[in-house]
Amino acid sequence: MHLHFSRRSISTVAVMLALLPIHSAFSQLQTSATPEAVVQSFYRFHFSHNMDFSRQNVQRRRQWLSPQLLGLLINEFHREDEYARAHPKESFVPYMEGDPFTNSQEYPSSFRVGKTVVSDEKANVSVLLLWKGRGKEGGDKRNLDIQLVREGGKWVINNILNKDNGDDLVANLKREKYLP
């Protein structure tokens, strides 16, 4: 039996074999990433992409979110749709107006990851959000507590708390009525 391989097919196989260890190393890095690294990666992605609260944008961030938080965020869109169907003649502002990941309607200009506290399968990472200031006064600041859990061997974001005003993303998403 005589097999014939083209240079192109041999080159393709060689490239795939060469990339295999890189893919494996990346997968290991993802599962062993620290809570701080996960939060840094999430907000770096978030700040460099569209921050609007939309189904598509939530799906783009799913790799960083716990199944619970992802489910609650997706459910929020269903709740909004149900409310709109039940009140077809009513004009309303959606409950989740703005960006739930920064707890703001006006997007911050930068962020800083701070102190991390790890306890078994849970972690808390402090994040400082910054808005560019006008004049000498400087900008606004907001302190967040990003709560993570270890799921499937990797750290994922499970809740976001605004330390300045006590806002709790998961509690807001679990509220009984769509609009107060």
Question: What spans do the regions from the language model cover?
Answer:
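Low-complexity, intrinsically disordered terminal/linker segments enriched in charged
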Residues: 120-145, 150-152, 156-180
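Short, aromatic-enriched amphipathic alpha-helices that serve as compact interaction elements
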Residues: 32-51
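N-terminal export leaders
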Residues: 6-11, 15
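Boundary of Sec targeting at the N-terminus
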Residues: 26-30
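Surface-exposed patches in mature extracellular/periplasmic domains of secreted proteins
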Residues: 49-61
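Surface-exposed, charged secondary-structure patches
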Residues: 66, 70-137
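N-terminal signal peptide c-region/cleavage motif recognized by signal peptidases
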Residues: 22-24
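N-terminal secretory signal peptides that target proteins for export/translocation
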Residues: 1-5
